[in-house]
């Protein structure tokens, strides 16, 4: 199992520490469930990329049920959801979808993930807080946002 090779954050305090403590690298947080097939596919891609991205990214897995406060804050209702931070700042990405705060679904290829992390890393180094997604539009999962209680 690829997820055994990646760092697991077990609670809110661990997630907070990872966000505050990761300096000069992209922090990638994958929110999901270990039993979900899409999460397992995502974990496999993350594990295969970890060595190549070790100088520019820290990859962590977060069990969504263990940190409900972050799931509520980032409005994580579909999994896997991948969120990016650099030096404690939440990085947003224009995926061509209504939500720029997170990537919903699994990445299709290892290269898609590597390209995205590189663009976020370079954008953050130039002071940007939002970057354009380099992933082909056909590789980005489609979904509709449904707003409750408006």
Pin down the residues of each PLM region.
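Short hydrophobic/charged patches on amphipathic alpha-helices used for structural packing
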Residues: 16, 68-71
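A structural signal for the main folded, soluble domain(s) of proteins
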Residues: 21, 28-31, 37-41, 91-93
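Non-catalytic, surface beta->alpha helical segment in thiol-disulfide oxidoreductase systems
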Residues: 77-79, 84-138
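Intrinsically disordered, low-complexity, Ser/Thr/Glu/Asp/Lys/Arg-enriched terminal regions and linkers
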Residues: 3-6, 52, 119-122, 126
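Intrinsic disorder/low-complexity signal
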Residues: 1-5, 130-150
């Amino acid at each position: 199992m690829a997820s055994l090779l990646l760092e697991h954050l077990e609670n809110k305090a661990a997630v907070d520490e990872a966000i505050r403590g990761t300096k000069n690298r992209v922090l990638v947080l994958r929110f999901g469930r270990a039993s979900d097939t899409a999460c397992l596919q995502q974990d496999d891609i993350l594990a295969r990329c970890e060595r190549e991205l070790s100088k520019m990214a820290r990859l962590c897995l977060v069990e969504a049920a263990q940190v409900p406060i972050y799931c509520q804050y980032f409005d994580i209702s579909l999994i896997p959801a991948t969120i990016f931070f650099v030096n404690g700042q939440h990085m947003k990405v224009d995926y061509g979808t209504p939500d720029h705060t997170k990537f919903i679904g699994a990445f299709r290829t290892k290269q898609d993930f590597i390209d995205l992390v590189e663009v976020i890393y370079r954008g953050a180094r130039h002071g940007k807080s939002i970057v354009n997604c380099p992933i082909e539009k056909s590789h980005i999962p489609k979904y509709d946002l449904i707003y409750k209680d408006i």
